[in-house]
């Protein structure tokens, strides 16, 4: 993949972080790590021939648009309720969670579930804990502008509770003053009141590119009943920021499947896992993570897996991962990585800025992968980024490696 393509792809906010400036700067740093102030040039422009249609490329999986939000709305993460409704987190212009009801319908009803402005300005990750309760993470930001940065020491975890009716309640679970950039949330299958949360390293200040020592990514453990939280994993090379793809990247989406924690690293392009004990710690404590697959040009965001939803058992551990302008499947068994939508298929420009994915939970849509995104289209240049949130339904019927 051409580096000129990577730079514009990153305009899709390659990380799960809601900071457009950081995203652009990250890939600019990857392309030109010695340049502090570089104006966009012709090579920065992604022309359609850079990712033009390849007659030899596979067709994308069938898909349809479930819902589009207005321009300026950034949809970041997704969880699926037991009744099949989708909950999606909004990062801009406000920290909200939306509900998409009966997403298998042609025109599903979309309504605001909760506005978290009491505690945060933007929401990033959302994950189900006990049935129909969800932990969401976010922070204050300096402005509503998508290019704004988060205010340090303001990250927190909140709970969204649908167990008492269709009008949910919310509460603050815990503040994380020492977190860098909370990202993805995944509950322990055997104790769903406890979640693990990925925390992406952040270089401070962003303008200082002198010290490029790999920065540590980390995993927090949060007890949602007590609010107690602690770091349970850090300083794994497989979680770290290495500056291979720029600044402010590293570990991103996480999922727990069986007795393993799975994650993807936007910086290394790798997918990894490590065995965990009943408390969420790696076992043994000096365990070496297993590399499942690497796509060096992939800028991973989040992913879905079979068998990670409440009440389900499955040996299928295929990872369906979002990466800037495409959706890919990763086989943990042999490391095979194949494109399913967007770049790498016969319609490379058709999947702009995907952010996260989850499978449906009803008989109607258990084969459907719901994918969220935040770009109107794949921009022709860095001057033409249009943020627009969306949800699409990908039909995975018959997919196999």
UniProtKB/Swiss-Prot annotation:
EC number assigned by the record: 5.5.-.-
Gene3D superfamilies given in the database record: TolB, C-terminal domain
Cleavable signal peptide: 1-21
Parts forming coiled coils: none
Glycosylation sites: 71, 77, 240, 334
Upregulation: Expression is significantly up-regulated under xenovulene A producing condition.
Protein's recorded name: Putative hetero-Diels-Alderase asR5
Lineage, opening ranks: Eukaryota, Fungi, Dikarya, Ascomycota, Pezizomycotina
Keywords: Glycoprotein, Isomerase, Signal
Function: Putative hetero-Diels-Alderase; part of the gene cluster that mediates the biosynthesis of xenovulene A, an unusual meroterpenoid that has potent inhibitory effects on the human gamma-aminobutyrate A (GABAA) benzodiazepine receptor. The first step of xenovulene A biosynthesis is the biosynthesis of 3-methylorcinaldehyde performed by the non-reducing polyketide synthase aspks1. The salicylate hydroxylase asL1 then catalyzes the oxidative dearomatization of 3-methylorcinaldehyde to yield a dearomatized hydroxycyclohexadione.
Single biological process term from Gene Ontology: terpenoid biosynthetic process
Listed GO MF terms: isomerase activity
């Amino acid at each position: 993949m051409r580096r000129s393509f990577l730079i514009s792809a990153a305009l899709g906010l390659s990380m799960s972080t809601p900071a457009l400036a950081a995203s652009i700067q990250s890939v600019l740093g990857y392309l030109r790590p010695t340049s502090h102030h570089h104006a966009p040039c012709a090579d920065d422009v992604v022309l359609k021939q850079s990712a033009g249609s390849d007659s030899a490329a596979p067709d994308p999986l069938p898909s349809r648009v479930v819902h589009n939000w207005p321009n300026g709305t950034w949809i970041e993460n997704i969880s699926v309720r037991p009744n099949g409704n989708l909950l999606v987190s909004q990062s801009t212009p406000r920290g909200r969670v939306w509900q998409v009801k009966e997403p298998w319908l042609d025109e599903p009803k979309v309504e605001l579930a909760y506005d978290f402005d009491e505690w945060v300005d933007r929401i990033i990750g959302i994950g189900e804990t006990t049935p129909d309760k969800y932990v969401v993470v976010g922070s204050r930001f300096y402005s509503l502008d998508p290019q704004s940065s988060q205010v340090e020491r303001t990250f927190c975890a909140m709970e969204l509770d649908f167990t008492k009716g269709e009008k949910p309640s919310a509460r603050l679970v815990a503040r994380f003053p020492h977190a860098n950039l909370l990202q993805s949330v995944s509950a322990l299958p055997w104790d769903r009141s406890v979640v693990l949360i990925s925390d992406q390293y952040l270089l401070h200040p962003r303008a200082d590119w002198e010290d490029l020592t790999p920065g540590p990514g980390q995993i927090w453990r949060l007890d949602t009943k007590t609010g107690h939280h602690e770091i349970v994993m850090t300083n794994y090379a497989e979680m770290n920021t290495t500056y291979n793809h720029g600044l402010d990247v590293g570990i991103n989406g996480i999922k727990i499947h069986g007795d393993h924690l799975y994650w993807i690293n936007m910086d290394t392009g790798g997918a990894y896992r490590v065995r965990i004990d009943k408390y969420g710690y790696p076992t043994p404590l000096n365990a070496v993570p297993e590399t499942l697959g690497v796509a060096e040009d992939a800028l991973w965001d989040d992913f879905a897996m079979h068998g990670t939803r409440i009440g389900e058992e499955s040996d299928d551990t295929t990872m369906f991962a979002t990466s800037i302008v495409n959706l890919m499947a990763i086989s943990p068994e042999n490391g095979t990585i194949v494109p399913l939508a967007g770049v790498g298929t016969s319609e490379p420009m058709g999947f702009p800025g995907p952010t996260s994915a989850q499978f449906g939970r009803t008989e109607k849509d258990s084969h459907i992968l719901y994918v969220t995104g935040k770009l109107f289209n794949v921009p022709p240049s860095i001057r033409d980024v249009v943020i627009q949130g969306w949800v699409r339904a990908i039909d995975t019927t018959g997919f196999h490696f």
